[in-house]
């Protein structure tokens, strides 16, 4: 059974590497201020979510969780052209998450999490995002935002991605 789990994990890892390579190619084909909404949709497909942005812009969310390490926010300006393409799972964005912040604001900032875990006895809900804190997949970490029952931030945590560690036998 343990061998089968490792085989599946290796396959999932290979798929992540291939998909992340696809993202690099897609991003290289787009240019801010030139590429259109149609260009973005042609390369990335339908967005996970669409958020209203400033001055009539729209922000498209392209989620790579749970297996990937990125979430992209692509801003389409009121003129229909791509104004920005950002990978949002970064320590700089994590530092912007503050106690009391509503879940919706965190969700707009970081995109859909890889996992949501309620802890009823603690009256907490943990939202987890997998990200890379360096150039290698061995640098993978998990950023956790802990919410109360009112879906307001209590605290944040960062830990090594448990998927990197083999299970105990």
Kindly label every feature range from the protein language model.
Residues 1-20:
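Sec-dependent bacterial lipoprotein signal peptides
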Residues 22-169:
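Residues within mature, well-folded domains
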């Amino acid at each position: 059974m343990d061998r089968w789990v490792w085989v599946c994990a290796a396959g999932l890892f290979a798929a992540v590497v291939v998909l992340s390579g696809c993202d690099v190619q897609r991003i290289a084909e787009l240019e801010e201020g030139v590429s259109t909404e149609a260009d973005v949709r042609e390369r990335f497909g339908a967005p996970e979510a669409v958020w209203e942005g400033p001055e009539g812009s729209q922000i498209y969310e392209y989620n790579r969780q749970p297996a990937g390490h990125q979430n992209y926010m692509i801003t389409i300006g009121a003129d229909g052209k791509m104004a920005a393409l950002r990978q949002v799972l970064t320590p700089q964005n994590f530092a912007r998450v503050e106690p009391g912040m509503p879940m919706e604001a965190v969700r707009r900032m970081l995109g859909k999490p890889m996992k949501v875990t309620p802890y009823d006895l603690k009256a907490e809900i943990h939202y987890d995002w997998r990200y890379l804190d360096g150039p290698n997949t061995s640098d993978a970490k998990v950023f956790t935002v802990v919410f109360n029952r009112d879906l307001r931030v209590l605290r944040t945590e960062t830990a090594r991605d448990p998927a990197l560690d083999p299970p105990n036998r």
